[in-house]
């Protein structure tokens, strides 16, 4: 049971209603996470803009979904794991591959493996990474720009992880183990 108010689309007003309308057009529904974040419409707008900015970054959709899965696993966010297993499959990953990404162990692609290992280390050390972590990330083919974009992507998914953990958001995506 959610701890915070989950604003139903039919009950949304003002900026929240406008944002929900845009989300529904893009996704076909307004997920429970966004219905919760809608309690603070400016924050919802910022979160959506952050994701739109990341979509225009030099990181691919597959890379962004790998980040989302690895970080959500490290954070223990069942809601985001369910949502991003689905969107990870839409980005071309198999169920088995999404499980590997969650474990930050993706042996079939050194580039993606370097990415998920970097973000897991970033989250588990709270950003206090040894120099060799950054060097390994660069050696996996990532630029300084992508270091910054990756940290931005981590911050975006950590926000939704924390909202959903605090709220105990009801999962409205296919559940995963």
Predicted regions and their residues:
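Hydrophobic alpha-helical segments
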Residues: 1-177
């Amino acid at each position: 049971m959610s701890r915070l108010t989950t604003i139903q689309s039919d009950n949304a007003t003002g900026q929240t209603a406008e944002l929900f309308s845009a989300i529904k057009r893009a996704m076909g529904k307004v997920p429970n996470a966004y219905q919760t974040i809608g309690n603070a419409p400016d924050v919802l707008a910022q979160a959506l803009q952050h994701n739109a900015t990341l979509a225009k970054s030099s990181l691919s959709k597959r890379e962004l979904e790998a980040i989302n899965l690895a970080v959500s696993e490290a954070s223990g966010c069942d809601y985001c794991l369910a949502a991003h297993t689905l969107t990870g499959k839409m980005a071309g990953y198999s169920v088995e591959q999404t499980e590997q990404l969650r474990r930050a162990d993706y042996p079939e692609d050194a580039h993606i493996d370097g990415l998920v290992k970097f973000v897991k280390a970033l989250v588990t050390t709270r950003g206090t990474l040894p120099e060799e972590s950054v060097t390994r990330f660069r050696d996996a083919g990532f630029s300084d720009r992508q270091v910054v974009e990756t940290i931005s992507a981590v911050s975006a998914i950590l926000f939704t992880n924390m909202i959903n953990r605090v709220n105990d958001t009801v999962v409205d995506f296919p559940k995963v183990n």
